[in-house]
Amino acid sequence: FRAVPAEGKKYTYEFSRENFYVYMISHMAKHFYENGCGIRNLVDIYVFNQKYGHSIDRTQVEQELKKCGILNFERQMSELALIWMENRKCSKFYVNLFRYMIDCGIYGKSENGIWSQLCKQNAPQQKKSFNLTYYFPTAQYMKEYYPWLEGKEGLLPLAWLCRGVHGLLHRDSMERARTLKDREKYRMMMEIYHNLNLNFVK
């Protein structure tokens, strides 16, 4: 709805550069939030900022990113893009983030979807509570996958049961459970997601 008629075109609409960048980052954030995303997105960020970074209205961009809950996400990813493309020195956080994105492949992996949910409910050091969170998620989380829970929170135990049966029958769910047993990976992933502060408004 923010597209405007393209100059010299009768039937073509396009985003302003500012809105295109916000769309690009929000699309990346959506994938990162749900399944993780690959390093190809970093190339997009780097190329755009090299080409248009000095001419776009950065204040407008940051206001829109803040509304979407992804301003800090964009700042961290822009920094990582510079680190990678220009071979800059960086902290361990960016090394871990880059390795995670490489492992995600191009489109991410379904088993990565659990990290954003665990991060919402646990601090990085709260490893002892992740089992409870993973096997018995909050009603808010469960409603995303079981819409019939809306207004019927008393049926939450039934939804947990359905989720458990689904987990036993699907390979991705079993892989997630195995991954969560790796204490070092759990700590690293919690640090990544907390530092990105990804409060993505879906």
Regions from the PLM with identified roles:
Residues F1-K202:
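Conserved NTP-donor binding/palm subdomain of two-metal-ion nucleotidyltransferases/polymerases, i.e.
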